[in-house]
């Protein structure tokens, strides 16, 4: 293992009458402290995962945009979700990859909070979009006759815009408040990304109210959306079990099963990480949990949807021009 070195660089001196303060103007993202050969291995592994994630989600978004037969609300929601995943994984992974090859592993003060903002905003938009997709499934299966009149193109556009706008506004105030707190050193963030837990630990002045505000918002967005999704699929399951046709039941189970698998992948690590102030979590476990929902989940989402959905597989074959590829 690499020895932990206390970095004292990145401090900005601010002089006042009778006093002198040093404030942080950059942070050190410590990441994984390990030998250089292991750093190279992790860089290669995460680069491959990142490339596969971009390719998989990009392929789904592209084929759903190209195939007009799939221009329905259900598939358009999925296309937006894949597009969102590309930006979500790109908010943290490129900097993470650069740090694997860097000795200093620094990130500017503004860069850290921008990463924090986009990572949380895109994650919130993802949670909201999964909730909207559950609502769409509920309408399609439980209210099939009313579905075309309710889920119109106009409503679809409104819901997608609402997910993006609310996602980018949800954590804006707490992130601004945290950024205004004094950080006077040390400036080491013992994490792979700029995360509120390690940032609160570096704050010179304790801010329990801001902490409570931040974790309350996290709990609301995670549990609120999760409970809505579970409630929707409870009603969907009840409706599916009452279907007289076995073919209809199989198709409904296939579609809903894919969505529930993605929901489980997204929400399980989030619930562990952000519904409490992080008590009882070792820094190593926090890093692994973050990597799981920041990299592994976006990687498997396109696989789950494409392998379970015949329409998407057919569209992929059509666009790629070869049935042997998939």
UniProtKB/Swiss-Prot annotation:
The protein's matches in Pfam families, at most eight in alphabetical order, are given as: 7tm_4
Provide the membrane-side ranges marked Extracellular in the record: 1-44, 94-112, 180-216, 281-287
Q: Which UniProt keywords apply?
A: Cell membrane, Disulfide bond, G-protein coupled receptor, Glycoprotein, Membrane, Olfaction, Receptor, Sensory transduction, Transducer, Transmembrane, Transmembrane helix
Is Disulfide bond there in the keyword field?
A: yes
Transmembrane parts of this sequence: 45-65, 73-93, 113-133, 159-179, 217-237, 260-280, 288-308
Lineage top rank: taxon: Eukaryota
The residue spans the entry assigns to the Cytoplasmic side of the membrane are as follows 66-72, 134-158, 238-259, 309-326
The cross-references to SUPFAM superfamilies, in alphabetical order and at most eight, read:
Family A G protein-coupled receptor-like
Q: Looking at the keywords, is DNA repair present?
A: no
Q: In what way does this protein cross or attach to the membrane? A: Multi-pass membrane protein
User: Per UniProt, what is one GO molecular function of this protein?
Assistant: G protein-coupled receptor activity
Cysteines engaged in disulfide bonds, as pairs: 112-194
Q: Where in the cell is it found?
A: Cell membrane
Main subcellular location of this protein, as a coarse class: membrane
One GO CC term of this entry?
Answer: plasma membrane
Family of this protein: Belongs to the G-protein coupled receptor 1 family.
The task this protein performs is described as: Odorant receptor.
What is the name attached to this protein's record? Answer: Olfactory receptor 11H2
Q: What is the lineage of its organism?
A: Eukaryota, Metazoa, Chordata, Craniata, Vertebrata
Q: Which gene specifies this protein's sequence? A: OR11H2
């Amino acid at each position: 293992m690499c020895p932990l070195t206390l970095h004292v660089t990145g401090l900005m001196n601010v002089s006042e009458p009778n006093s002198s303060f040093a404030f942080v103007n950059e942070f050190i993202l410590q990441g994984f402290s390990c030998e250089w050969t292991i750093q190279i291995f992790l860089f290669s592994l995460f680069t491959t995962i990142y490339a596969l994630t971009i390719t998989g989600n990009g392929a789904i978004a592209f084929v759903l945009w190209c195939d007009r037969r799939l221009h329905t609300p259900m598939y358009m929601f999925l296309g937006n979700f894949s597009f969102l995943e590309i930006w979500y994984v790109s908010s943290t992974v490129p900097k993470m990859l650069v740090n694997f090859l860097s000795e200093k592993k620094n990130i500017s003060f503004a860069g850290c909070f921008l990463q924090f903002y986009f990572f949380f905003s895109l994650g919130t938009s993802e949670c909201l979009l999964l909730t909207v997709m559950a609502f769409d499934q509920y309408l399609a299966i439980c209210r099939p006759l009313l579905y075309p009149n309710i889920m119109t193109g106009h409503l679809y556009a409104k819901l997608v815009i609402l997910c993006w706008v609310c996602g980018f506004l949800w954590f804006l105030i707490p992130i601004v408040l945290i950024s205004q707190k004094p950080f006077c050193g040390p400036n080491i963030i013992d994490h792979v990304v700029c995360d509120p837990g390690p940032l609160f630990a570096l704050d010179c002045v304790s801010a329990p109210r801001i902490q409570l505000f931040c974790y309350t918002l996290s709990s609301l967005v995670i549990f609120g959306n999760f409970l809505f999704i579970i409630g929707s699929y409870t009603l969907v399951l009840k409706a599916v079990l009452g279907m007289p046709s076995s073919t209809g039941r199989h198709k409904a189970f296939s579609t809903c099963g894919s969505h529930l698998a993605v929901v489980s992948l997204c929400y399980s690590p989030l619930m562990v990480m952000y519904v409490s102030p992080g008590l009882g979590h070792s820094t190593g476990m926090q890093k692994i949990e973050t990597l799981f929902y920041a990299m592994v989940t976006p990687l498997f989402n396109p696989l789950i949807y494409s392998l379970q959905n015949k329409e998407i597989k057919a569209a992929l074959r059509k666009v790629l021009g070869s049935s042997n590829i998939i």
